[in-house]
C-alpha cells in the first residue's frame, strides 16, 4: 500500500467540509475541502497492494477510517461527491463494484447518498470545457483556483470536493452548481 498526501492547509477544528472521491482501482483519491474557504484542503491518493475482493475490502477500510478521522477532527461533512461510473468502460464491472463500496461507506458514515458527477460535468466545472485531457485539468485547476497537483486522481477528487462544497467563482461554475441540483445526480432515498 502507498499513500500520497497533498496538504493544502486544512486544519483540525470545528468547521464544515465537503469531500470528493475519485474512485480508481489503481489510485483511489479522496479530498476534503473547507466550505468557507475551499482552497484549504487535504487530499490523498491511496494505492492498495491487493486485487479483487481483497482490494475492495482494503479500500472500504481505508475510506471508512479516513471519514471517521475527519469526524474526530471536528469536521462536519456537509456533502460528498464521487465521480459517476462510465458504463462504456472496459472495466465497468470492477468500477461498479468499487462505486458500491464507496456508497456503502458514505451511507454508514453520513447517512446520505453522495452526488454522482459524470466525468464531462466535472471537467466543465474544473476547466471550463467538458473535453479537457488530464494534463489540461491539472493546469486549469492551478490557474482557476491556485491549487497545484501532480496527480490527476488527486486533482479530480479535489474538484469533486469543491463542487460538493457549493463553491462557484464564475458563470460556468454557477451553471454546474445549478445543474447538479437535479435529483438524477443523487440516489433516491425512500
Question: What do these predicted regions represent?
Answer:
Residues 1-190:
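Phosphate- and other anionic-substrate recognition elements at nucleic-acid/protein interfaces
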Amino acid at each position: 500500500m502507498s499513500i500520497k498526501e497533498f496538504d493544502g492547509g486544512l486544519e483540525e477544528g470545528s468547521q464544515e467540509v465537503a469531500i470528493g472521491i475519485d474512485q480508481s482501482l489503481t489510485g483511489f483519491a479522496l479530498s476534503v475541502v473547507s466550505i468557507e474557504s475551499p482552497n484549504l484542503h487535504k487530499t490523498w491518493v491511496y494505492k492498495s497492494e491487493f486485487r479483487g475482493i481483497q482490494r475492495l475490502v482494503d479500500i472500504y477500510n481505508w475510506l471508512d477510517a479516513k471519514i471517521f478521522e475527519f469526524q474526530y477532527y471536528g469536521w462536519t461533512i456537509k456533502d460528498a461527491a464521487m465521480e459517476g461510473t462510465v458504463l462504456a468502460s472496459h472495466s465497468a464491472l470492477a468500477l461498479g463494484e468499487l462505486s458500491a463500496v464507496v456508497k456503502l461507506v458514505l451511507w454508514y458514515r453520513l447517512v446520505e447518498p453522495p452526488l454522482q458527477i459524470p466525468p464531462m460535468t466535472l471537467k466543465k466545472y474544473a476547466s471550463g470545457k467538458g473535453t479537457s485531457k488530464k494534463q489540461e485539468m491539472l493546469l486549469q485547476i492551478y490557474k482557476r483556483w491556485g491549487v497545484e497537483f501532480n496527480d490527476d486522481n488527486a486533482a479530480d477528487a479535489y474538484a469533486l470536493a469543491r463542487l460538493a462544497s457549493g463553491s462557484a467563482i464564475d458563470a460556468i461554475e454557477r451553471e454546474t452548481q445549478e445543474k447538479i441540483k437535479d435529483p438524477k445526480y443523487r440516489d433516491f432515498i425512500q
